[in-house]
Amino acid sequence: VRSACADVRTLVEAGAEVVVVHGGGAAADRIGVELGRPPRYLTGRGGRRSRYTDADALDVLRLGILGRVKPDLVVTLAGMGVSAVGLSGVDGRMVTATRNRPARATVDGVEMVVRDDLSGRIASVDPTLPRTLLDAGFTPVISPPALSDDGETLNVDADRFAAALAVALSADWLVVLSDVPGLLRDRHDPTSLVAAAPADLLDEHLELADGRMKVKVRAAAEACQAGVGNVVLADGRVDSPVLAACAGAGTRFVKERHARAS
């Protein structure tokens, strides 16, 4: 995290406008275990697994994202001389979402119709607040949750949140960091990197991805197709991960199929 924050400082000092988007699921999981409220997951049709976010789980998730991860990032950036401001999608109605409909899923080995899941899909992004902060020389540090039209707080995926925000801000770059070198043809072989991934071949890329990587790939492809010029899925574990991604590391998503790399 410190290395990525140092990259943010370097970019800001060079005159770039940077928005940091983060999640906090891992921190929330640890807090939940500490509180005796460990995370639970839904397995829907097709085997897709997602966080079960009932009211209690949403409270824990907010503790992790807004109470632990965000303050740590803001303080780290501030210590490096970056004027960071912490926000969530709820602030200024920045990000609105549509709540997921009741659906049949398996929870704790039991199949049921889930009606109390407070998760949703992003419906709109208003970039006014982050744009105002950027114009004033601040670096926004933004995360879920989002807000429904009815005023409910909803959990949304942080990677797709980042993609939607990048599109709304007409960003030149979107760098999505992960714990692998990028999209791999063989997930067990870190040297099997897909260097260039045409966004119109999303289904093929999703077949290569597994677990959380599927969401990251989908988010990257969506941003690319919506006009973000440079979209990279890269390794967040390396030194200077953001600068490395901008210099060519990781998987770059491109619009043109003829740019496909083997």
Language-model segments: which ranges?
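C-terminal catalytic "cap/lid" subdomain
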Residues: 1-262
